């Protein structure tokens, strides 16, 4: 009891809601300073990391966040109903895996431990042709697609291994690969192209919030190549798998503890409810106009999702290539739907809670239970075409469709949760989708080289600008660190 009175211990043990209140209380309440060395736009993980690194260099920093909270695409949800044990689940980015060294280091520094995603037992595959099967491994044992899928995934790995993660557009085949969608390439190279594409949708819908027909092949190869670090080549399985993959672990208490603890340390560097409306560069400085006032800075780091950058009024105008890039980057469409049960009953049946369905609302399903194992939580990623079909339905109809998808995998008990929670990222004004902004065909080769290129005194962060683990929390950390280095070198 007595030790918890110490501020440090108390801060470390605060849950999401209490930390959120503490961050809001510690953030800047009054007028903004008229001048700063650097302004960071965006209070997601990337912006917070950039602000911390700049402050560590001794710079006077102001961080402007549009929302009344920090975390961006990382968001905890606190369960409060009977039988839920007050558990926390993640409505946004959640997973961490091998080679995601930068987010791992940050979490360790902030005292946020990880736990293994439950992975004991079999996964479930539901096919509209062959019915329900239990399996182990990466690819379901569907005889109509397995030979094709194995060959194509091997080819994806070998093509991705040739990609320069810092300049994917420089590959000799870049123009050819960027001219086609992943879906077109699959159909051209598989005997059962439709079947393989249907399976790959169960990877692209959660991972990109998009379908194979929307994504440039070059972009997808780069995304796979990014699924590693400086000493480990990215592979499809490291991106898609649980064991030894990007879904291997989660954070105890939920991933939003990381940005919340980071923001609490930054104190009044953080200003909430301060959407940036105009950025003008003149006379060797940058004027940042926000809803909370104007700040003059020597440098600015923009760490907002690419589509939102278009909503800022720029003077002078953004360079043509940067403007075209932003216009061609589309946020994925994604929502997360969680059903909560008193226990993870599927584990009793020897199942790990992971499932793939080639149709319906619940195409890709994970065990989203907290570390303690209770309550049991099943999570469906509803993305891309599946979001377009089910995202428009009334909540009750969508809930029924998701639960029916769970029941097809795990039995009738899945129809009777004690709670149901959903979060539609397309409805978030300051994100507009998720989990990442994607490259349509023809975008990367023509405009991709602008992604990190500073614009005068403006630098770019955000997970989309990372050369490793783009689209992930690790990419967000890396991008924030890189942007801070750029600013430090150009003071």
Residue map of PLM features:
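FAD-dinucleotide binding site
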Residues: 2-491
